[in-house]
Amino acid sequence: MKVQSKAISKPKEHESAIYRNANFPDHLVETYSDDVHTLFDVFRHSVKQFGNKKAMGYRNLVKEHVETKMVTKVVDGEKKEVPKSWSYFELSDYNYLSFNDIYDKALRYAGALRKLGLNKGDKFELYAPTSAFWLLTAEACLSQSMTIVTAYDTLGEEGLLHSLRESGVRGMYTEGHLLKTLVNPLKEIESLEVIIYRNDAKEEDIKTIQEIRPNLKLIKFADFEKMSPPVEPDPPSPEEICCIMYTSGSTGLPKGVILSHKNMVAIVTAIVKHVPEVTSKDYLLAYLPLAHILEFAFENICLAWGGTIGYANVRTLVDTNCRNCKGDINTFRPTIMVGVPAVWEMVRKGIMSKLNAASAVKRSVFWTAYYTKAKLMRHNLPGSCVLDTAVFNKIRSMGTGGRLRYTLSGGSALSPDTKRFLSIVLCPMLIGYGLTEISAAAMVQNPACFNLDDSAGSLLPCTEMKLVDCEEGNYNSHGHPPRGEIWLRGPSLTRGYLNRDKENKESFTPDGWFRTGDVGELTPEGLLRIIDRKKNLVKTQNGEYIALEKLESRYRTSSLVSNICVYADQTKVKPLAIIVPNEPVVRKLATEQAGLSPDASWEEVCHNKKVRQLVYDDLIRIGRSHHFANIELIQNVVLVPIEFTPENGLVTAAQKLQRRKILDRFKKEIDAAYAE
C-alpha cells in the first residue's frame, strides 16, 4: 500500500511533524467549483447540474398496527401476567422529489419564513427527527442568510432550554408530538416568535402554548407549505455562520459548535475529492439524527454527488417492525449507508443469529467462503466476486436490499472484528474519524486503498494533523510508531464554541490548532489508528492505564451483549462491565445452561448468578482472543434489565455513553460486583 499521509514539516520537541493527505501536500482544499462557496451554493449547484434527477425519497405512514400480548413481569416482588403492546407500521412506497422539486420547495419555504417575519441574520432552530422536510427547511433558511441551530429531538427540557436561551432563536421547526417539551421553555424564552410543527399535535399542548404565549405564531406545516410562492435567494457570504450545532452533551450541557459556510463547503469538497468512486448513481439511506454532524454533512455531500437520499426511520429500518410492506432498507435498497458502531454491531449480530440457526452444512459453507475471501482481500487477489455470487449476495439481499457498495462507520470506536466481518459479508466498510468541531470528519478510509485493518483511514485533503505527547498513558509522538494527542487544523475547523470562552481557550491554540482530546497512532502507511480519548484513559490501582473505549468496542462483539459500559475504579486492579444483555440470546442461554424457566422475568434472568457467570466467561474469552493484558480483563459483570436510551438519559442521541449517569444509576450493583 502506498503511503497516504505526507509530512510537510519537521518534528518539534514533544510533537510530531505536521501531516497532510499525500495527494494534496501543497494546499488544503476549500471548494470543488468556482461557484460554490456556501452550503446554499452546494445545493444550488447540484440543482443546476442534476435538474430532474431524483434527489430525495420519503415514505408516508399508511397505518399503525398495535398488537397486545400478556407477558410475565415482577411487580412488588411477585410474578404477574401483564399486558404489553407492540406497534407495527404499514408504510407507502417511496415518494421521490427531483432536484428541481426540492429547490422549488426550499424557496417556497423561504418565502413563508419571510412572511412570518424572519429575516437575514436571524437564528432558526430545527428540533425534529430526520426527514426530507427537516433538510429542506434548513436549505430555506440558508437561502435567506439565516443561521440554523440544531437540537436533537431527544434532547429533553433542560438541554432544549439551554440551546434556545444561548442561541437566541426567533423561529423553530418541530414535530407535533414534541410540542409538550416546549411548554416550560416557552415560559422563559421570549425571543422565540414562530413555531412550525409537522404532523398531528395534541389539542391540549397547542392550547397550553397559546395560553403561555398568546402572541406566538404556531403554524401547521401543511399551512406553512402553502403560504408563499418561491422567492429569490438572499445568500450568505462564506464567513457567515451556517449553523450552530449542539453536541449531544455526554459531559454536561451541550456545547454550541459554530460552523461557517466555509467550514461546511470544505468538508463537502474534501469528501467529494477523497471518494470519487461515489457518483450520482448512488443511493444514500438517511436515518441518523440530522442534528448530528455526521448525518448533516453526508446528506449535503450526497446532494453534491448528485445521489438520491432515501429517508428512513430507525423503527422501520428492517422488515420485522413493518406490516404489509418491507422495511426501509429493503424498499429503498441503498448503495451507501452511514452508521454508528451500535448500528453495525446490531447488523453483525443479526447475521450471526441467522447463521447460528442454519444447518451445519450451511455454516461450514459460509465460514469456508468467509476465510477464503478474507485471504483474497488481504493479498489483493481476484476471485472474491465468485464467493459473493455463491454465498454472500443472498445475505445482502435479505438484509440490505442487495445493492450496498460502501458503508461508513463513525461517531466512536468500532471493533476491528465487526469491520472485518461486515466488509467481507456485505461490502467494504470505510472507517472515519471526526468531531463536530471539524465539520464531521478529519480522516476517512480511501476506497481505492481499502484494506481490512483497524485504522480510521487517511487524512482528508481539507485537514492537517500532528500528534502531541500525552502524559496520560505515556504516549510519545517521536516513538515507533508515533503516538499522541491528535491536533487538527484546516478550513473545516470551527471558529469555536458559542459563548464558551473557557472551553475555547482550552481547546484551541492561538495558531489555529484544535486539541481533540483523542489519542492516535500513525501507521507506517500514513493511516491513523484511534487508541482512545484522554478522559477515558483510567489509571488503575497498580499505576497502569487502560483505555475504556477500546475495551468496550471489543467486548461489545459478544453475541450476549447488546450494549456495554466498562468502568474502572482507580482503587481497584481491574475494570468491570455494566451490560445490557442481548435478550433473545441470553434468555435461551438462561433456559438451556442456567436452569431457569422460559417464563422467568427479565429481571430474574439478569440477576441470576449462573447467567452472570456465563456472560462473564464469554467476555473473558473475547479478551483473551484479543490478547488483552491481565488488567484489561473484566473482574466482574453487572447485567441490567433496561436498555441504555436517550429517553432514560443513559446514552446521548448520538448513542454515546453517559458514563456518570450510568454509574450513578447502578452504583449499588457496581459496589456489590466489586465486593464479590
From Swiss-Prot:
Cofactor dependence: Mg(2+)
GO cellular component, one term: lipid droplet
PROSITE patterns, per database record: AMP_BINDING
Keywords from the named record: ATP-binding, Fatty acid metabolism, Ligase, Lipid metabolism, Magnesium, Nucleotide-binding
Enzyme class: ligase
Enzyme Commission number(s) of this protein: 6.2.1.3
Motif (FACS): 511-560
GO biological process assignments: long-chain fatty acid metabolic process; long-chain fatty-acyl-CoA metabolic process
Any one Gene Ontology molecular-function term assigned to this protein's record: long-chain fatty acid-CoA ligase activity
Chain positions recorded as ATP binding sites: Y246, T247, S248, G249, S250, T251, G252, L253, P254, K255, G256, V257
Entry-linked InterPro entries: AMP-binding_CS (IPR020845), AMP-dep_synth/lig_dom (IPR000873), ANL_N_sf (IPR042099)
Catalytic reactions of this protein: a long-chain fatty acid + ATP + CoA = a long-chain fatty acyl-CoA + AMP + diphosphate
Domain note: The FACS motif is required for catalytic activity and substrate specificity.
Family the entry assigns: Belongs to the ATP-dependent AMP-binding enzyme family.
Function: Esterification, concomitant with transport, of exogenous long-chain fatty acids into metabolically active CoA thioesters for subsequent degradation or incorporation into phospholipids. It may supplement intracellular myristoyl-CoA pools from exogenous myristate. Preferentially acts on C12:0-C16:0 fatty acids with myristic and pentadecanic acid (C15:0) having the highest activities. Appears to play a role in the maintenance of cell viability during stationary phase.
Official protein name in the record: Long-chain-fatty-acid--CoA ligase 1
Source species: Schizosaccharomyces pombe (strain 972 / ATCC 24843)
